[in-house]
Regions:
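Short, solvent-exposed amphipathic alpha-helices that sit
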Residues: 1-16, 31, 35, 58, ...
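Short, well-ordered coil/turn elements that cap or connect secondary structure elements
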Residues: 14-17, 69, 89-90, 128
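Hydrophobic alpha-helical
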Residues: 21-82
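Flexible loop/hinge segments that line or gate small-molecule binding clefts
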Residues: 80-88, 92
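Short beta-strand elements at the ligand-binding edges of bilobed clamshell
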Residues: 89-101
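Hinge/cleft segment of the Venus flytrap/periplasmic-binding protein
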Residues: 99-139
Length: 139
């Protein structure tokens, strides 16, 4: 889902960019590091990197060891200590983070409504929660 939204955005608002095919990290930092090193080596004109799943520590390690930290636009997913540090030191540009407490609350409310006796509450509902966006400047 993360990747399809990313690609959709670029199709609509930045069609001049060439998006590479995604590579799987299998949620492993070592694999992400190797894949990032390969991308940096094979695509010298790379202007950005979007890490939408696991392995962010490996991708960040590859950026730092290659000297590319701070030279690419790097977007990651979920604010946690490693991504916070990467924002602060300039290795990452942006972190998209789901509002986990609000997401959990909405899920529990939905489950309660689904098992309640109120027929209106049993109707399918959709709750849209805005994602939180973090940059170095708003931490």
């Amino acid at each position: 889902m993360n990747e399809s939204g990313f690609r959709s955005y670029f199709r609509e608002f930045a069609p001049e960019f060439t998006l590479l095919e995604p590579v799987s990290t299998f949620e492993q930092s070592a694999v992400a590091e190797e894949m990032t090193e390969r991308l940096l080596r094979d695509h010298r004109d790379l202007s950005g990197l979007y890490v939408s799943g696991g392995g962010i520590t490996g991708a960040l390690a590859a950026l730092r060891s290659s000297g590319m930290a701070g030279k690419l636009n790097v977007v990651g997913y979920e604010l946690m200590p490693v991504t916070r540090d990467a924002l602060l030191d300039g290795t990452m540009t942006l972190v998209i983070s789901p509002p986990l407490p609000r997401l959990a609350t909405a899920a529990i409310r939905g489950m309660i409504a689904a098992v309640s006796n109120n027929s209106e509450a049993k109707a399918t509902t959709t709750t849209v929660l805005p994602f939180e966006i973090y940059t170095r400047e708003n931490l």
